[in-house]
Amino acid sequence: MQPVTIALAKGRPAKQTIKLLQAAGLTFEELDATSRKLVFYNEDRTARVIFLKGMDVPIYVEKGAADIGIVGKDNIIESQAEVYELLDLGIGKCKFSIAAKQGVTLSSDNEITIATKYPIVAKRYFSKRNQSIDVVKLNGSVELAPLIGLADYIVDIVETGNTLRENGLEILEDIETISTKAIVNKASFATRSAEIQSIINRLSTVVG
């Protein structure tokens, strides 16, 4: 039988996730967040961890290439993947927020321009406000957009807000708090329920 495959977001998020796995007694040979390896097996090879870009984790899980994924809610929302969310791991907590240049207020007008790495989040939020928006999809340095006139506002993930303040921006409104989730492929949960639930249960004991 194929090992249960657990997809992790590589890079900085992996360090916290690996600590959780280890605390839950889930150990994998040579598993290290800084390793260039992408696949790690447990001792009896009944489970394996794979490292992916965060945005790809929900896709691998949805398509069945991974049974379980541990990834930020931001990536789950933006991927629009059809998966089960089984557990909030309580790590990687931050907020989706709307920000603009200091002194600017949040307009209720239509056709405002939003710069963001998260167009799904932005469109969903402003749709609830019955506002039509023009979204500029960026991949980095979102804070720059209002400063040079590319956008009226930004929607971004905020932890401390220091980067915004250093660039003359301020938070106008928080959209929602997000954190790291354990997600599961729907078919896998039906066919490998005992194995998957065992892993989820072990994780749940260390996250309270």
UniProtKB/Swiss-Prot annotation:
It catalyses: 1-(5-phospho-beta-D-ribosyl)-ATP + diphosphate = 5-phospho-alpha-D-ribose 1-diphosphate + ATP. Its EC number is 2.4.2.17. It is found in: Cytoplasm. InterPro entries: ATP_PRibTrfase_cat, ATP_PRibTrfase_CS, ATP_PRibTrfase_HisG, ATP_PRibTrfase_HisG_short. Pathway: Amino-acid biosynthesis; L-histidine biosynthesis; L-histidine from 5-phospho-alpha-D-ribose 1-diphosphate: step 1/9. PROSITE patterns: ATP_P_PHORIBOSYLTR. The keyword Transferase applies. GO terms for biological process: L-histidine biosynthetic process. It holds the Pfam family HisG. GO terms for molecular function: ATP binding; ATP phosphoribosyltransferase activity. Its main location: cytoplasm. NCBIfam families: hisG. Heteromultimer composed of HisG and HisZ subunits. Catalyzes the condensation of ATP and 5-phosphoribose 1-diphosphate to form N'-(5'-phosphoribosyl)-ATP (PR-ATP). Has a crucial role in the pathway because the rate of histidine biosynthesis seems to be controlled primarily by regulation of HisG enzymatic activity. Belongs to the ATP phosphoribosyltransferase family. Short subfamily. Lacks the C-terminal regulatory region which is replaced by HisZ. This is ATP phosphoribosyltransferase. It comes from Oceanobacillus iheyensis (strain DSM 14371 / CIP 107618 / JCM 11309 / KCTC 3954 / HTE831).
